[in-house]
A protein has these predicted regions:
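C-terminal helical "lid" of AAA+/P-loop NTPase domains
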Residues: 102, 183-188, 194-206, 231-232, ...
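P-loop/Walker A NTP-binding region and its immediately flanking N-terminal helices
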Residues: 1-155, 160-161, 171, 184, ...
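Conserved GTPase G-domain signal focused on the G5
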Residues: 79-81, 191-194
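Short, structured loop/turn "capping" segments at alpha-beta junctions
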Residues: 175-179, 193-197, 207-214, 240-242
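Loop-to-helix "switch" segment enriched in basic
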Residues: 208-235
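Alpha-helix N-cap/N′ positions at the starts of helices
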Residues: 14, 177-180, 221-229, 238
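Helix-rich C-terminal "collar"/helical-bundle subdomain used as an assembly and partner-interaction module
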Residues: 229-309
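Short conserved motifs of the RecA-like P-loop NTPase core
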Residues: 165, 176-188, 212-213, 225-226
Length: 309
């Protein structure tokens, strides 16, 4: 995408840096604002679906505090060595700032041993260091950690608010668009605003003379009915390779909606074995967080469902 304005990733360019520009979660914003006025915060766990603003909120907080901070992505650094070496090392070093903050992004990837070690560090350095953890699945955070934090659910803004925000960004970038262009985009990726913005970035065309317009390539959007096709194929005892092809053709890298549909509609394709389906989905949904190729993981689930027919 070319633009006569600052050329950067839209998702970063329009990441809010002020609480008042953060969309939604008004009660949480009021609570955090009170803490920031005192230049201190509690330990927090922010949880919610991908792309709903958990990390953005954490970064707004550290941007407003007079603090030193350490940022770690726990999906990359998830072991006890990271907690002992980097987190404890940071917390134990003297600082000229009145406060230190550790952000552990995607903390639900931390091993149980790492979480247990973190619990002790939170207690040991409670006078000087605060911790902000973000996660998609709060149930994967051990209870002793949750009890030492304020656990706050970050609720995504409504589809209408997401569409309104995207329209505002497009206008700011002087990108011509039709409001109907945003409907399939929001329906496809909601509540993940990050994916919406990345798709807009890929779909913005330079018409010459700085005339920018949005042209959504339908191949970028996952077919809205591929989930129905998978369910129908399972019901009709379609061969595994044919179902695998349906999934491959969807171009999806996020199968949360398919997991949910397989659970909700188990009676349609495996009547009498809904409990077995629930167990299989639970196992593969958990494994999806640790697999590089999620298509292989979902295909494995489909194979096991077929084998239970």
């Amino acid at each position: 995408m070319k633009n006569n304005k600052e050329n950067s990733l839209l998702v970063e360019k329009y990441r809010p840096t002020e609480l008042e520009n953060y969309v939604g979660n008004e009660q949480i914003k009021d609570k955090i604002s009170t803490y920031l006025n005192q230049n201190d915060i509690q330990n927090f766990i922010f949880y919610g679906p991908a792309g709903c603003g958990k990390t953005t909120l954490a970064k707004i907080i550290i941007g407003k505090l007079d603090c030193d901070y350490l940022y770690l992505n726990a999906s990359d650094e998830r072991g006890i060595e990271t907690i002992r070496d980097k987190v404890q090392g940071f917390a134990s070093v003297a600082s000229f700032k009145p406060l230190k903050v550790v952000i552990l992004d995607e903390a639900d990837f931390l091993t149980i041993q790492a979480q247990a070690s973190l619990r002790n560090i939170i207690e040991t350095f409670s006078r000087t260091t605060r911790f902000i953890m973000t996660c998609n699945f709060v149930e994967r955070i051990i209870d002793p950690l949750q009890s030492r934090c304020q656990v706050l659910k970050i609720v995504p803004p409504s589809k209408k608010d997401v569409a309104r925000h995207l329209a505002w960004i497009l206008n700011q970038e002087s990108i011509s668009f039709e409001i109907n262009d945003l409907v399939p985009l929001v329906n496809q990726y909601y509540p993940d605003l990050r994916k919406c913005l990345n798709t807009i970035q890929l779909s913005t065309v330079d018409g010459g003379a700085n005339d920018l317009y949005l042209r959504l390539d339908q191949s970028i959007l996952v077919s809205s009915n591929y989930i129905d096709k998978v369910i129908k194929a399972l019901s009709n005892k379609t061969k595994f390779n044919d179902i695998r092809q349906i999934i491959a053709d969807s171009n999806s890298d996020d199968f949360d909606e398919l997991f949910r549909a397989l659970y909700d509609r188990a009676t349609e394709y495996l009547p009498g074995k809904e409990g077995t389906v629930a167990i299989l989905i639970n196992e593969h949904q958990y494994k999806a967080n640790f697999r590089i190729d999620k298509e292989i993981n979902i295909s494995s689930l489909i194979s096991q469902i077929i084998n239970n027919k």
